[in-house]
């Protein structure tokens, strides 16, 4: 039973029902996925920023944002508006072109990665057969922007922050990719839709987190390092580097770094839920739910309900992971740069390689359980 509806065809048929010719209806559809992607990612970031401020305040026995809207929900909007109207300062001896291009290279690849994130069986902007490979490729572009920003600022703290960001990304990109390869090996596909389909049918018992417990931990640690979350926020360690590669930035360029960081955090949580937590899959098999309700699985209202439940489950799983990441910020102390690199190269990399080899052996030995 499919967990979704065909958004594109439904939208085109609705427009044609209003009398629009097919060509004009397709013209309306073309920019819609990009607009939805940008709006959805931005709203997700605003929610995460508010959650982080409230959860951080609760961890420190404070109230947190309170006056900007009910419970302070409009505080991220107020902060964003403030940064938009602040003066854009470029240091006198900085390279203006690289200084401007750096933040763009940080944000743009992360937004493009949302193209392959599925919220339901057909609720995905672009279902390409190399979706996960595209995400890994795009995620490797952002460190270039960070290094470029640090170098172009003509500031020693910015340069050190940029170098740390590049070293950190390279160190953890490889274990993360190896953990993803183990999932790809089990699902026999690089498509995010196929990876979720491979986990469906058995509810929570079919999720990859049970077959890949080591890969799940490797991916989570590497994802936190890629997002530069504590305890891996060395590129912008305020006690050592003022603000790292962000030191010389102000106004909207400064806001782009924070936007990129939080958008990347939401993206990592979404990809994590797709790879290990069944994506839009419900903890109870939806076939069983249909049987309990006494309706056919192909009933139209049940299909719409499944699509809504799929979106809800994907978002809930992702925000649960974000909640854990926020708690870790106030629980675990920052590591040193040598500890960071040792963890990536001397521990996570060999463990990820061993996990990949063990997954290959289990796939050959138990093909039914491991996607043979």
From Swiss-Prot:
Gene source species: Synechocystis sp. (strain ATCC 27184 / PCC 6803 / Kazusa)
Membrane topology: Multi-pass membrane protein
UniProt cross-references to Pfam families, sorted A to Z: NADHdh
Main subcellular location: membrane
One GO BP annotation of this record: aerobic respiration
GO molecular function, one term: quinone binding
UniProt protein name: NAD(P)H-quinone oxidoreductase subunit 1
Leading EC class: translocase
PROSITE patterns, alphabetized: COMPLEX1_ND1_1 (PS00667), COMPLEX1_ND1_2 (PS00668)
Family the UniProt entry places it in: Belongs to the complex I subunit 1 family.
Cellular compartments per GO CC: plasma membrane-derived thylakoid membrane
């Amino acid at each position: 039973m499919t967990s979704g509806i065909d958004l594109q065809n439904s939208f085109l048929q609705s427009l044609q029902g209003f009398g629009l010719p097919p060509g004009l209806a397709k013209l309306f559809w073309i920019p819609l996925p990009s607009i939805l992607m940008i709006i959805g990612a931005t709203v997700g970031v605003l929610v995460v920023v508010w959650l982080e401020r409230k959860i951080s305040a609760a961890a420190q026995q404070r109230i947190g944002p309170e006056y900007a809207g009910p419970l302070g929900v409009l505080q991220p909007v107020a902060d964003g508006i403030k940064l938009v109207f602040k003066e854009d300062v470029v240091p006198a001896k900085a390279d203006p072109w690289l200084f401007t291009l750096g933040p763009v290279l940080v944000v743009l690849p992360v937004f493009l990665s949302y193209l392959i994130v599925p919220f339901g069986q057909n609720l995905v902007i672009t279902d390409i057969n190399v979706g996960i490979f595209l995400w890994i490729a795009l995620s490797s572009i952002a460190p270039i922007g960070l290094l470029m920003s640090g170098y172009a600022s003509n500031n020693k703290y910015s340069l050190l922050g940029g170098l740390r960001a590049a070293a950190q990304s390279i160190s953890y990109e490889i274990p993360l990719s190896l953990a993803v390869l183990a999932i790809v090996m089990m699902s026999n596909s690089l498509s995010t839709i196929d990876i979720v389909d491979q986990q469906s049918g058995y509810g929570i018992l079919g999720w990859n987190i049970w077959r890949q417990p080591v890969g799940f931990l490797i991916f989570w640690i590497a994802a936190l390092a890629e997002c530069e979350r504590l305890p891996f926020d060395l590129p912008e360690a305020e006690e050592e580097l003022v603000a790292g590669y962000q030191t010389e930035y102000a106004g909207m360029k400064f806001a782009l770094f924070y936007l990129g960081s939080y958008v990347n955090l939401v993206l990592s949580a979404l990809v994590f839920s797709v790879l290990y937590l069944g994506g839009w899959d419900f903890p109870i098999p939806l076939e069983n739910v249909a049987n309990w309700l006494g309706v056919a699985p192909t009933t139209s209202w049940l299909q719409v309900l499944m699509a809504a439940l799929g979106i809800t489950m994907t978002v809930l799983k992702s925000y649960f992971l974000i909640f854990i990441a926020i708690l870790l910020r106030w629980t675990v102390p920052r590591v040193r740069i040598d500890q960071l690199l040792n963890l990536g190269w001397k521990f996570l990399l060999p463990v990820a390689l061993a996990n990949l080899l063990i997954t290959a052996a289990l796939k050959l030995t138990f093909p039914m359980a491991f996607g043979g």
